[in-house]
Amino acid sequence: MNKPNQVTFSTFNLLNYLEPPNAYYDFENIYSFDEWQKKQNWIAEAIRSLDCDVIGFQEIFSPESLQRLMKELGYPYFAVVDNPHVEDDYLYTSPVVGIASRYPIENVQPVKPDSELLSAFNLNDNFSFNRTPVHATITLPHL
């Protein structure tokens, strides 16, 4: 358990987190019920082992499913700032990132590219993130 005067953060790449019967990137990529349950159980065990306060997630195709799982694991606050792209009925081709917290997420918004930084790195104004980052303000009642 964390000390009362600290907050811990982690990141977690979920590797194609998509609830069946949907497919990721190709119509052949669909988890069976058993595979999905194993993935959910493995993620839950990993989250328990991390025992952190705030988690940033990558490769989310099923945000609602992840939000439910995180709530069950003691993270009642969850946010994404974008929607996964669905190519054709149930074929998902572009996941999103998200954040889960044990503490209230007061504000969440997409991170926008900064024009000065774009210029400094010789990037044009058409630059966009492959997956829109999340900027979140979290209330920490114990600090």
For each feature predicted by the language model, list its residue ranges.
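N-terminal, active-site-proximal structural segment of metallo-dependent hydrolase catalytic domains
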Residues: M1-Y77, D82-P95
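Structured beta-strand-rich core segments of catalytic domains in phosphoester-bond hydrolases
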Residues: I60-L143
